[in-house]
Each structure stands twice: as C-alpha cells, then as structure tokens.
From Swiss-Prot:
Binds 1 Ca(2+) ion per heterodimer. It comes from Mus musculus. Heme b binds at D223, E373, H466. It catalyses: 2 a phenolic donor + H2O2 = 2 a phenolic radical donor + 2 H2O; thiocyanate + H2O2 + H(+) = hypothiocyanous acid + H2O; iodide + H2O2 = hypoiodite + H2O. Disruption phenotype: Knockout mice exhibit inflammation and lesions in the cardiovascular, respiratory, digestive or excretory systems, neuropathology, and tumors, with high incidence. Expressed in the colon, including colonocytes and mucin-containing goblet cells. Not detected in the ileum. The keyword Transferase does not apply. InterPro entries: Haem_peroxidase_animal, Haem_peroxidase_sf, Haem_peroxidase_sf_animal. The active site is at H224 (proton acceptor). The lineage of its organism: Eukaryota, Metazoa, Chordata, Craniata, Vertebrata. It is an enzyme of class 1 (oxidoreductase). Keywords: Antimicrobial, Calcium, Cytoplasm, Disulfide bond, Heme, Iron, Metal-binding, Nitration, Oxidoreductase, Peroxidase, Phosphoprotein, Secreted, Signal. The record marks R370 as: Transition state stabilizer. Ca(2+) binds at D225, T299, F301, D303, S305. This is Lactoperoxidase.
C-alpha cells in the first residue's frame, strides 16, 4: 500500500527551508527524485560508517588513546544492528534533503513507503517463516509473538510509553539550540547539574548495610540482557567525528557535553566531553510519527542473550561447533586453575590490551560486546559460559542420543530460566520492596496482547544502578579476608581489565567480593562516586575519564525523553510545581531548592535525575517513580513472553519444580573453587555469618530432562 505524507506538514515539523521548486507532473518524477536522492545520501553515509570503523581500528594501534576510543569500542554497532542504524540514517538524511527542494512531487504527497524501500529499511512483511511448534526461542527474538512476530525482537525501535519530545518535534534534542526554552525555562548544562547534584565532596561511600555487591552487579546483568542502543555515525558529508572529538563543534549527531566555568576538567580535557547520539531506526508504517526512535539492538526478553547473542552470526561463533555436546566455545590459550575463560576477541589490539600493553591480555568475546567493560561483568560472563557447558555436558550423559543442537538449545533454555527466576525471585523483591506486588502481580500465564518491547524510558530507569556502585572492587581469599597485596582495586582501574582475571588471581577472589562486600546505597546527598563521575573509562593516569551522570542526562535529551512531571503523571503520582511541593516529594528541601535553581520548574528535571533523587520506598532501593517504571516493564516482559519459564508447556511440571532449586550460590559452587557461600547472596553478608558449605546448597536435578530415545 502506498503511504503518502503531505509535505507542508512535514516542513512545519522539520523547520527546514523550502524552495519554490516543484517537480513535473510525470508520475515517474517522484520515483526518480527519491531514488537519486537516496543514492546520493547512501554514498556519504556509507563512507561515514566505514571511516568510523577504520578510525576505531587505527585508534587501537596508536600509542595515544582517549576515553572516547574506549567508549567507541563499547558503543560501536555491528552486524544487523549496524545495518539497521545505517538505514535509519539514510532515511532521515534523505527526508531532509527531499524536503528542502520538493513541494508536492506528485500532487498528492511524498511516498514514504518508496523512500523506506530505497533506504533499505525493513519491509513491512515478515522476512522469515516462524516455526510455531519449535520449543526454543529464536536467537533474534523473532517469532515469540505469533500474531506479531517482530514484537520484542532485536534491532527494532524502543517502545514509547509517552510521545517523544524534541525541540523541533522530529529529532533535535532539547538543549541543542542555545537559549531555547522548555516550559518557559532554559535547560541547565548536564555537567553543571552533575557537579551540583550528583557529586559529593567526601569520597567515602555510604554503603548499603542490607545489600551485597551482587545486588548491584545483577542489575547490570539484567540491563545487558534486555537493552543496548549503540551510537550512530555522523549524518553529514562535510562534518566529521574529529571535529566533535577535538573541537567540541556541535552538529549533526555530535552533541558535546560542555564544561561549565570553573570546572576542574577544563584544565585537563579542554572544553567538553565528546558525545555522539544514539543509533536510530527507520520509522515504520503507517508513519503516524516521524520522530527519531532509538534502536534496541537486543531482544526485549529476559533470555540470556548477553550470553548467547541476539546476532545469528555471532551466536554461531560463540559455540564450539566441533564438539557434539552443544558446548560454548572457551579460551584455548589461558585458563583459570583449569576452569575455562571466555574466548578472546579477534580484534588486535583490543582495548583491554591497550590499557595494559605489558600484560597483553585481550578482551573477552561474549554474547554482548560490553562483556569486558568492567572486571565484575567479565567475571559474570565467565560464570555463565561455564554453567552452560556444565549443563550441556550433564544433559548429554542423561541423553546420549541427543544431538549437538538439542543439547545446546536445552542448556540455553535452562540458562534463560535461571536468569528469569533469579531476577524475579531474588532481585526484584528487594529492589521494589513493598511496591512489588502493586506493579508485578502473581503470574497468570502468557498473554499475547501484552507488548513486551523495552520502553525508551526503561533504559534510563535502569540506570539507577549507577548510584549503587561503590568506589572500590574487592578481592577476597578462601577465608573471605583481603586477597594479596592489591585486594582493594579503585573502580576506575577495573575498566577493560581482563588481565587481572587471567594473570592475577582469576575470578574466585572477585566472586567472593561480590558475595561478602556491600553495594553502595543510593543516597540523595551522595549520589555517584567520583570514580564514575570523573573517571569513567579512565584505566590509567594518561587517560582522562568521562562523567557518567552527565552522560545519563545528555542521553535522556538525545532520546527525546519527556520531563520528570510527565512521567510522574504517567504513573499516577503527584506533579510538584513549586519548591514546597517538590520538597515534599523529595522529603529534602535542600535538594529540592538545588533542582529548582537549576531547572526553574520540576517539569524540566531530566527523567534519570528526577527518578534517582526520590527517597526510597519501604524495604526497596528505588523511589516511587522508579518502582512504577521498572515494575511495569518487568511485568510486560514476563507476561508478553511466550517462552517464560512458568508458562505451561515451556517446561514440564517436574522441570519447573527442579528449576526453582537454581540459585546464584549454587552457580558459584558448581563453577568455581569456592566451597563456602551465603544462603542469601543478594543480601549483605559478613563471613562467616550466613555462609554455609556448598553441600548445603540445593542442586539442580536434571533427571526430569531425561528422555527415552524413540
């Protein structure tokens, strides 16, 4: 079906200059103009993407490195994700060019369906046939919903629970145009907000007396299993990333974070922190909105995709296809006291080698490109591949007639259930506290009318976890005492730090630290440690770090996020308008005044900051707004997942009973040299109180998976 857009309406939204030129009445004229324009745009968009990849490779081989290079490595789009983002870039740039010189090409409007086809956007029709009888998820998440196979699959737009809010109604973020008002007030610079609200002078952390480091780390695991929005490239044939990196020149997809007067970073890092906008996808029929929509490169489901990847080609590379046992590939060069590490990435040199050239240990290859971002995350990935291989090996003993594919898929299915169970049984109740039942009622079965897509706002709600990260990572010995001469590692030294795992102790000392050390408490007066607020991706003294709080604020504007009060209204909460009302919501007059001085109105407070600033709910670790946003999202990914572990038919009744015995403590017992673990690993634990021998921890009984060969 031909979908048309009346151009005057578009131009009002784009605020672009329009010439008086008009095309011929020839019905082929529009087709030719669209084709020629898209082909022209493709040339320089493709060049920008190629240049970016080459520049990243070159950056890793030079002796002068920057925080930007390390960030680029994490946020660099690959495979199908890269293709989807490139098509979105071509679509948007082509639309801008067409709107500059066309008035009414055919007398009816611009054919957006044709434009989408020329730009390489996904066709509306399904691109694959779904095997509705398959007991296994697809790698991409496609076919989960039988009526709408693409729902929740990888490389689609994040869902909008509220309409996007951009300066121009289309793509420009608020804060882009100097002096531009929002709700009658100018927006403050993100770094200024960070300096005044997120910082604290005394760097001593306020530790959470009831939550372990594992509680913090599990939040990142869940996040990396459900959402990832890589950055896009420059949108212009004349503007380069170098201009953004080196000269802080705002333009196209460069949106630098400027340092305010008096900021200490002005002396060491110049005028700004470089910031590139998130990748986005083409609009989809029926084109009711042309506002920029950011991509989710992952499946929306809690399915262990961080272990297995949502990208089919990578998923295959992560497997040991030479083994008949359905195993994941492991590192053939190094091991951890005989236990496997993940394979190394092939990129030479990788950022992990760059930050410690002497050690020369590459980053790990995993289902998620961020696996080596920090040492505790790399430790978690190591545990997961070990557990997969343990499960696959045990299943092969039970079912020697099963082929490699069945063993792989069954182990993968169990791993997905483990992450689901651990998240909903152990993590969410102590995160959402007394509010959990309000937002996540007991499971009633799969509902195909529930939209499981990750919402755009959820990608900011989950960033509350940044305020739970302490300034130190601990390594402990078998008696849970300090391990070696460097038992306490400053947080900024563990980014891209695989060499510590491979050459300095393995994962066991770090796992003990996860179990026996405390998370940081999310505190209104001590929000974010300076290790993240000033030293993000600063692995050594030669590289100056980023500010994660500023990035979160700038990213929310990049995504066109509505402000604090809009989300309070969405959740049925009060919308403060005055200092007194905001003070009552925050239960903190000093904080409320700082926010009002910066933003002018509570309506303008950036969603991430407003949400994390709220006082915690009873027995939880987030405030009322976050319990709403997090609770609704987790309810949707559970009820809208056809392969949810509790959905009848996914597992047998006996298998479900057995799966409930799985626990993180058992995962540790089965895949490390640790023999004493806490009964409640997500709660704060002080050894030996609450610790038991591994023989006291329930094991997963795999006998319900035994089958008789037909």
């Amino acid at each position: 079906m031909k979908v048309l857009l009346h151009l005057p309406a578009l131009l009002a939204s784009l605020t672009l200059l329009q010439t008086a030129a008009s095309a011929s009445d020839d019905p082929t004229a529009e087709t030719d103009i669209i084709h020629d324009t898209v082909e022209e745009v493709k040339v320089w968009v493709n060049k920008a993407f190629l240049d970016s990849r080459d520049r990243l490779k070159m950056a890793m081989t030079t002796k002068i490195h920057s925080t930007r290079h390390l960030s680029d490595y994490l946020k660099h789009a690959k495979g199908r994700t890269r293709t989807a983002i490139r098509s979105g870039q071509v679509w948007e740039e082509s639309l801008k060019k067409l709107s500059q010189f066309l008035t009414n090409v055919t007398g009816q409007g611009l054919d957006l369906t044709l434009l989408s086809w020329e730009a390489g956007c996904d066709p509306p029709a399904p691109t694959m046939t779904c095997n509705i009888s398959s007991p296994y998820r697809t790698i991409t998440g496609y076919c989960n919903n039988r009526k709408n196979p693409a729902l929740g699959s990888a490389n689609r737009a994040l869902a909008r629970w509220l309409p996007a809010e951009y300066e121009d109604g289309l793509s420009l973020p608020y804060g882009w145009t100097p002096g531009k008002m929002r709700n009658g007030f100018p927006l403050p610079q993100p770094r200024e907000v960070s300096n005044q609200i997120a910082a604290y002078l005394n760097e001593e952390d306020v530790l959470d007396q009831k939550r372990s480091m594992l509680f913090m780390q599990w939040g990142q695991i869940v996040d990396h299993d459900m959402d990832f929005a890589p950055e896009t490239e420059m949108g212009s044939d004349t503007y380069t990333k170098a201009q953004c990196d080196e000269h802080c020149i705002q333009g196209d997809n460069c949106f630098p974070i400027m340092f305010p007067p008096g900021d200490p970073k002005l002396k060491t890092q110049g005028k700004c922190m470089p910031f590139f906008r998130a990748g986005f996808v083409c609009p989809t029929p029926p084109y009711k909105s042309l506002a920029r929509e950011q991509i989710n490169a992952l499946t929306s489901f809690l399915d262990a995709s961080l272990v297995y990847s949502p990208e089919p080609s990578l998923a295959n590379r992560l497997r040991n296809l030479s083994s008949p046992l359905g195993l994941m590939a492991v590192n053939e060069e190094v091991s951890d006291n005989g236990r496997p590490f993940p394979p190394f990435v092939k990129m030479k040199p990788s950022p992990c080698e760059v930050i410690n050239a002497t050690a020369g240990v590459p980053c790990f290859l995993a289902g998620d490109s961020r696996a080596s971002e920090q040492i505790l995350l790399a430790t978690s990935h190591t545990l997961f591949i070990r557990e997969h291989n343990r499960l696959a090996t045990e299943l092969s003993r039970l079912n020697p007639h099963w082929d490699r594919e069945t063993l792989y898929q069954e182990a993968r299915k169990i791993m997905g259930a483990f992450i689901q169970i651990t998240t909903f049984r152990d993590y969410l109740p102590i995160l959402l506290g007394d509010e959990m039942q309000k937002w996540i009622p007991p499971y009633q079965g799969y509902n195909e009318s529930v939209d499981p897509r990750i919402s755009n706002v959820f990608t900011f709600a989950l960033r509350f976890g940044h305020l739970e990260i302490p300034s130190t990572v601990y390594r402990l010995d078998e008696n849970y005492q300090p391990w070696g001469s460097e038992s306490e590692l400053p947080l900024h030294t563990v980014f891209f730090n695989t060499w510590r795992l491979v050459k300095d102790g393995g994962i066991d000392p770090l796992v003990r630290g996860l179990l026996a050390k405390n998370a940081k408490l999310m505190h209104q007066n001590k929000m974010m440690t300076g290790e993240l607020r000033n030293k993000l991706f600063q692995p050594n003294h030669t590289i100056h770090g980023f500010d994660l709080a500023s990035i979160n604020i700038q990213r929310s504007r990049d995504h066109g996020q509505p402000g604090y009060n809009s989300w309070r209204a969405f959740c049925g909460l009060s919308q403060p308008k005055t200092l007194e009302e905001l003070s009552a919501v925050m239960k903190n007059e000093v904080l409320a005044k700082k926010l009002m001085d910066l933003y002018g109105t509570p309506s303008n407070i950036d969603i991430w900051l407003g949400a994390v600033a709220e006082p915690l709910v009873h027995r939880g670790r987030v405030g009322p707004l976050l319990t709403c946003l997090l609770g609704q999202q987790f309810q949707r990914i559970r009820d809208g997942d056809r392969f949810w572990w509790e959905n009848p038919g996914v597992f047998t009744e006996k298998q479900r009973e057995s799966l409930q015995k799985m626990s993180f403590s058992r995962l540790v017992c089965d895949n490390t040299g640790i023999d004493k673990v806490p009964l409640n690993p997500f709660q704060a634990n002080a050894y030996p109180h609450g610790f038991v021998d591994c023989s006291s921890i329930d094991k997963l009984d795999l006998s319900p998976w035994a089958s008789v060969k037909e």
